């Protein structure tokens, strides 16, 4: 069989023709997941995952939303999970935003009158913020879990940022070091699952990717004053990856008339995989918040 006719395969060597996927504007294949309720969905919710991970880690959260008659959908970002692309490398952070909007457009074609929400964690929070700012009237609300708004001051000091920018010109693929999994959660079993997950990129963050994250932080700062949609912001006070001060900055900067911040004292970065009392609270907060906003959005759609 000629090579040109061979099916495209995931980095794990599974043919994309056997998997749900979309093809982005650059011709890259992205692995997708869908959690569909049995009847007509009350809302569409796109889940945007964080750096180095994949959308399968949001199954528990998605299943909860599905039980509320919501259609949850997601994809592995370029360079992540089962999607194509060099691991944790992207030519421009806008690619993540563009792909999100493409996926939303695709799903909305089948449900044009159903309100759509965004849910983003960490880097996925930054992607969601930028998507919402790009389409200020498109989304009915947004849920942010430990979003990337401010980088951790220890890892993004002025000297380190300058060094990274210089290295990006000469050694863009050199590693800045691995993500320390012990700072993700106080739940050791969840940390162990993270460490053993073969779909997570456990290699170090490359300089070129770190620069894209810094660029995203700058873009988010400029976008926050344009965020007028309702949003729920969940943040751990002891987050060592995304500075918790960013949560307060977003609350101050956004002109939204419907914005809620829930700060979890002592909690780490991955709140939906934290100690049971934190994770249960997070799921409850999301459940309550999104159910109410769906009712409001549905009322607006009535003739």
Swiss-Prot record:
Database matches in SUPFAM superfamilies: alpha/beta-Hydrolases
Residues where 3'-nitrotyrosine is found: 58
Active site: 122, 239, 269
Keyword Membrane: yes
Iron-sulfur among keywords: no
Gene3D superfamilies referenced in this protein's UniProt entry, alphabetically: alpha/beta hydrolase
GO term, biological process aspect, one: regulation of endocannabinoid signaling pathway
Cellular compartment(s): Cytoplasm, Cytosol; Membrane
MF GO annotations: hydrolase activity; monoacylglycerol lipase activity; protein homodimerization activity
EC number: 3.1.1.23
Catalytic activity: Hydrolyzes glycerol monoesters of long-chain fatty acids; a 1-acylglycerol + H2O = glycerol + a fatty acid + H(+); a 2-acylglycerol + H2O = glycerol + a fatty acid + H(+); 1-octanoylglycerol + H2O = octanoate + glycerol + H(+)
Sequence positions bearing Phosphoserine: 189
Residues where Phosphothreonine is found: 10
Membrane topology label: Peripheral membrane protein
One Gene Ontology cellular component annotation held by this UniProt entry: cerebellar climbing fiber to Purkinje cell synapse
Pfam families xref list: Hydrolase_4
Tissue specificity comment: Ubiquitous. Highly expressed in adipose tissue, adrenal gland, ovary, heart, spleen, lung, skeletal muscle, kidney and testis. Highly expressed throughout the brain.
Annotated pathway: Glycerolipid metabolism; triacylglycerol degradation
Annotated function: Converts monoacylglycerides to free fatty acids and glycerol. Hydrolyzes the endocannabinoid 2-arachidonoylglycerol, and thereby contributes to the regulation of endocannabinoid signaling, nociperception and perception of pain. Regulates the levels of fatty acids that serve as signaling molecules and promote cancer cell migration, invasion and tumor growth.
Other observations noted: Requires non-ionic detergent for solubilization. Short-term inhibition causes analgesia, while long-term inhibition causes tolerance to endocannabinoids acting on brain cannabinoid receptor CNR1, and a reduction in brain cannabinoid receptor CNR1 activity.
Recorded family membership: Belongs to the AB hydrolase superfamily. Monoacylglycerol lipase family.
PANTHER family linked to this entry: PHOSPHOLIPASE-RELATED
Oligomeric and partner information: Homodimer.
Official protein name in the record: Monoglyceride lipase
